[in-house]
Amino acid sequence: MFCDLHTHSTFSDGTFSPTEIVLKAKEIGLDAVALCDHNTVAGLDEFVLAGKKYGVTTVAGIEFSTEYNSKQLHIVGLFIKKENYSDITEIMAESQKLKEESNKLLVKNLAKDGYILDYDEIKNSTVDGFVNRANIAAALMHKGYVSSVKEAFQTLLMSKFGYYVPPKRPSSLYIIERLKGFGSISVLAHPFLNMNEDELREFLPKAKACGLNATE
């Protein structure tokens, strides 16, 4: 069985719509595909409907931006039930508010050094009105300040450059516990992105006790 259990759509930082992801999965012969947009379930209804329409097994998911010991960790939730969409939206509401404040501060800090961006213009260009750093990276590229989105992330949008101040995020362990309560599967995504081996060994037993099911 061939599956892709971690994709993103245009509802976060992907380049395909939820329907296009389903069509691509069908084209390349996947047996199942999961949509795990960052901090939103906004694309899941379209995704699941497209799966039924085109005969592709879909897995409703989400990727939460969380925090543990001041490090950002991404927790993927799989097999999200529609009945829990409102709970997840409520969990993310405060996080989205803090994220928007962080994004506005980023644009303001960039402007101080001559990187002029229009935040409202960026926001209006998104599918659901939620801005992430990928949107800001694209705006920097379109303005000619960087040659690519990748360059933006490797330079101006890195915390060490001083423009980006990360927002406060929900606890990793709290999100894992909530996913367990929903009857969903929780997965630690790309574990070595922000943790070394010792930190991972310290985190995993606690995460498992809270209900963590897997790592990527």
Regions found by a protein language model. Give the residues of each.
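Glycine-rich, often acidic, oxyanion-interacting loops/wings at catalytic, nucleic-acid
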Residues: V131-I136
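Active-site phosphate-binding and catalytic loops of NTP-dependent enzymes
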Residues: P166
